[in-house]
Curated annotation (Swiss-Prot):
Positions of the DOMON domain: 55-167
Compartment(s): Membrane
Signal peptide: 1-22
Taxonomic lineage from the root: Eukaryota, Viridiplantae, Streptophyta, Embryophyta, Tracheophyta
Cofactor field: heme b
Annotated cofactor note: Binds 2 heme b groups non-covalently.
Residues noted as binding heme b 1 in the record, renumbered to the chain: H213, H279
Sections of the chain in a coiled coil: none
Record keywords, A-Z: Electron transport, Heme, Iron, Membrane, Metal-binding, Signal, Transmembrane, Transmembrane helix, Transport
Official protein name in the record: Cytochrome b561 and DOMON domain-containing protein At3g07570
Transmembrane segments: 212-232, 247-267, 279-299, 321-341, 343-363
GO cellular component: membrane
Binding site for heme b 2: H246, H315
Length: 369
């Protein structure tokens, strides 16, 4: 019995020791010895910084030759790709990145440069970007459950806004396209290459306001107003239901659009944006036309009035012009915000559905004559 108890205790101690050793092996710090032996530059020059504490990213770097910067990024091997991006403004779009991974099946590691052209996977292009990489310097290896990705850049001073990312667990890019999937975790920092100090860049406090501005205008001016116009043109056989539906849709669309315009004005004031004058001008024009359309309801002549045909001409054509300007300005706003293909594709699909519906109803109306 005593022998059995002693055996259990020894087993537990060995298990605990194994767990502790594994945790220590998967952890790196600036005080740790770099476990790489085949480096072609003087490692004593390397500066070290805890790049991303929650993910235990450690970045070592140095200017190891004239206009040559050597980097070693280490991170836990979580069966996912790791990446570091170099940005001019702290934003993902337009940045260039170095991404590396080692497949769980024991395959060889891969490191590739990527151009972060947008937020969707299709806009993140391998073997592109504006980083000048020293030939043969891209390499990644796994040591004690930890990835060490190294590369060298030719630059007077690399960009100081750095992006770090961890890919989805179990996914590894593969040939022929080497497309990445959306990362699980991401952060943005700024680094002082002289001191090694890094600071995390907080997410813009205006991101929610931007999204609200876009969605309100998109659903208000860009969808509901169009649906209301379709109802008024093609549903008159259901009188007076069509009229009340038309009023409800246009009023709701106007209120959403008004909210979107107000959000846009607040956003412009907070961001001190200087490249939105055309977008703002179109938005205010659309709002004025919307107000005129709402006021037109109060001045609507009777059907028997000789002025009714002029009112109809005004109401219909101002409405058509409003819709054209609204669609154009929404796409222009998406372009200014660099929102990517998801917004363009989503709204483009909605407009296409509405256009096909309107065309189909027009054809049916023509055939009935």
């Amino acid at each position: 019995m005593k022998l059995y108890s002693v055996s259990i205790i020894i087993f537990v101690l060995i298990a605990l020791s194994t767990i502790v050793n594994a945790q220590q092996a998967a952890t790196d710090s600036c005080n740790s010895t770099l476990p790489l032996n085949d480096l072609t530059f003087n490692t004593s020059l390397l500066q070290c910084t805890e790049a991303w504490t929650p993910q235990n990213f450690i970045l070592r770097y140095a200017r190891t030759a004239e206009n040559t910067w050597s980097f070693i990024l280490s991170a836990p091997d979580s069966s996912a790709f790791i990446g570091i991006g170099f940005s001019t403004n702290g934003q993902m779009i337009g940045s260039s990145a170095i991404v590396g991974w080692i497949p769980s099946d024991g395959g060889s590691g891969t490191v590739k440069p990527y151009l972060l052209g947008g937020k969707s996977p299709g806009e993140v292009n391998p073997d592109q970007g504006d980083l000048t990489i020293v030939n043969g310097s891209l390499k990644i290896e796994s040591v004690s459950s930890r990835l060490y990705m190294r590369f060298q850049l030719t630059a007077t001073l690399p960009r100081q806004s750095l992006l770090y990312a961890v890919g989805p667990a179990g996914f590894f890019p593969s040939s022929p396209d080497f497309r990445l999937r959306e990362h699980r975790f991401v952060t943005t920092t700024t680094i002082n290459y002289n001191t090694g100090s890094q600071s995390v860049v907080k997410v813009s406090p205006h991101s929610k306001l931007k999204k609200t501005h876009g969605l309100m205008n998109m659903f208000g001016w860009g969808i509901l107003i169009i649906v209301g116009a379709i109802v008024a043109r093609h549903m008159k056989q259901w009188d007076p239901t069509w009229f009340y539906a038309h009023i409800a849709l246009q009023t709701t669309g106007f209120l959403l659009g008004l909210t979107g315009v107000i959000c846009g004005l607040v956003l412009e004031n907070r961001l001190k944006a200087n490249n939105v004058s055309k977008h703002k001008g179109l938005g205010i024009t659309i709002l004025v036309m919307g107000v005129l359309q709402m006021l037109a309801l109060l001045a609507r002549p009777d059907k028997q009035s000789k002025y009714r045909k002029y009112w109809n001409w005004y109401h219909h054509n101002i409405g058509r012009l409003l819709i054209i300007l609204a669609i154009s300005n929404i796409f222009y706003g998406i372009h200014l915000a660099k929102a990517g293909t998801s917004w363009n594709g989503g709204y483009g699909f909605a407009v296409a559905v509405l256009a096909l519906t309107a065309i189909g109803l027009e054809v049916r109306k023509f055939l009935k004559k």
